[in-house]
Amino acid sequence: MSSAFDFEPQPRRASVAVDVGGVIVGGGAPVVVQSMTNTDTADIDATVAQVAALHKAGSELVRITVDRDESAAAVPKIRERLLRLGIDVPLVGDFHYIGHKLLADHPACAEALAKYRINPGNVGFKDKKDKQFAEIIEMAIRYDKPVRIGVNWGSLDQELLTRLMDANQANGSPLTAQQVMRETIVQSALLSAELAEELGLPRSRIILSAKVSGVQDLIAVYAMLAARSVHALHLGLTEAGMGTKGIVASSASLGILMQQGIGDTIRISLTPEPGGDRTREVQVAQELLQVMGFRQFIPVVAACPGCGRTTSTVFQELAQKIQEDIRASMPVWREKYPGVEALKVAVMGCIVNGPGESKHADIGISLPGTGEMPAAPVFIDGQKALTLRGPKIAEDFQLLVADYIEKRFGHGQAAAE
């Protein structure tokens, strides 16, 4: 085992840039956040509402299911409705089994979509496979659309898997079944991309993905793909699960890959709680990119975890309130206060780390812990600015944060500069 540990992120892997409806994926562009609806695409009202919500949350690409004629017919109407709302987010069509037929029968759908997602494992079977794959590629060429060749181990090409398993058995030093499965996933993606290029689709119109549900498997297959291709890569852990488990599994796998410079666009595939908010997956994707230092989307609120010194819940409530206000305000703030996403706010619960952490923030407050004087020093740009006292410390600090944002990022600051 090597004793060397490279703690810095590796340079981004060189990949071919792909233009997806005006959003650049790969080629050194910032890692793109995308999401997927779970509405019936034929339900235009519901799909428009969810796409709008995902876009507002920060999704830069939104994938929708196109599984039957009614869904395909709805796509151009959804696109038109979104544009009337001022929402120009690129829509990605998710096709399985009959994508070739739907694109041919619904040219308006083919035109309205910004990208087509193809699954090599179910695009067609036996002698129909290459023919139906070719038909989708021909449509992509006709309408000048990129495709994502998305392999998923739950629908893996069984013919290819069988062939590689048989070849492995004949090998004097056979691989494990897991290793053969990983190789099958990678070959399925690479062979499909090779065929697409032979059919005339340029490399600048191809994105690859290879999704599995195991963290170690995902890291392995993407490392293999990255080493054996220059295609832009879409990262995602499929069937990640619900709640904390899904967030941890996705963050662990995608975080490791991105630290190695691998990945051009990501989706956090969370199973929402019944009645849960679909935009949660967008928030998690943004937070992952932000905490790793790859992108900035929203001001950071640093808050201590609490301990026996902080029996009061005031600092927790204040931190939560500020975080909620920031997220709700960001759609307006992005336009009104350019650069505000770099802001750091600290809300600390006692004297131990409170003043120090607050000094490191742009604006911070150190609330009194158990047994401490009922006073809260506020630090602005590293200096103690004032001390808040009384029953409205939380409200007063929120006003100070709003005032700081206006002065630093508002028009007044721009004029002063």
Swiss-Prot record:
One of its GO terms (molecular function) is 4 iron, 4 sulfur cluster binding. Its EC number is 1.17.7.3. The keyword rRNA-binding does not apply. It catalyses: (2E)-4-hydroxy-3-methylbut-2-enyl diphosphate + oxidized [flavodoxin] + H2O + 2 H(+) = 2-C-methyl-D-erythritol 2,4-cyclic diphosphate + reduced [flavodoxin]. Binds 1 [4Fe-4S] cluster. One of its GO terms (biological process) is terpenoid biosynthetic process. Gene3D superfamilies: Dihydropteroate synthase-like, Sulfite Reductase Hemoprotein, domain 1. Its cofactor is [4Fe-4S] cluster. Keywords: 4Fe-4S, Iron, Iron-sulfur, Isoprene biosynthesis, Metal-binding, Oxidoreductase. NCBIfam families: ispG_gcpE, PRK00366.1. Converts 2C-methyl-D-erythritol 2,4-cyclodiphosphate (ME-2,4cPP) into 1-hydroxy-2-methyl-2-(E)-butenyl 4-diphosphate. Belongs to the IspG family. This is 4-hydroxy-3-methylbut-2-en-1-yl diphosphate synthase (flavodoxin). It comes from Rhizobium meliloti (strain 1021) (Ensifer meliloti). The lineage of its organism: Bacteria, Pseudomonadati, Pseudomonadota, Alphaproteobacteria, Hyphomicrobiales. The gene is ispG.
